[in-house]
Amino acid sequence: DLLDYGRGILSAPESAKMKTAYIAAPLVGSIYCGSPEEEEENVEEYVSLPVSLFGKGDFYILRAKGDSMVDAGIAEGNLLVIERNCPASEGDIVVALDQEQQNTLKRYVGFDNDEKCFILAYENEARYPEEVIKLKSFEVQGVARHVIKAL
C-alpha cells in the first residue's frame, strides 16, 4: 500500500524512506535575453531545489525576459538556475556583466584573437541570424545550469 491509515495516522511508508536534501536558491529578479540592460538584484523569494535534480552549488534564480535565447530552450518567463562563482567555458550560457554594468544572458562563444574581443551569441536564428555581442571585457556573474518552465 502506498498510504497506510493504521491507528488513525495517515502515513506513506515508501515516501518516509526517501530523504531528499534541498538547497535554498534566491529568486533575484529578471535578466534580459536581448541587448544588455541594467538590472537590480532584489531577492523576491527563496526556491527549494532538490539536490538530487539540481546538484550542489551556489545557485540563484533569474526570470528570463525577451526572446533571443529561444533556440537554446529559454523562453520569456522561464526560470533559470544560475551557478555563481564558477568559470565559464566556451558554449556555456552565461550571465554577462559588461563595462557599463549592464547584464544579459547569452551563449559564450569565446575570444576573437583578430578583433581582440569576447563574443557572446544570441540563440534565435529566425529573429537574430548571426547576431553577436562583442565586448573588450566582461564579468561572468554565473553560468546557466537549468531551465524551469511550465508545459
Question: Language-model features: where?
Answer:
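Low-complexity, intrinsically disordered Gly/Pro/Thr-rich segments
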Residues: E123-L135
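Conserved PDZ fold ligand-binding element
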Residues: E76-R84
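Short coil-to-beta transition motif at edge beta-strands of beta-rich domains
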Residues: A88-V95
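Catalytic Cys-His active-site segments of thiol-dependent hydrolases/isopeptidases
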Residues: E115-E125
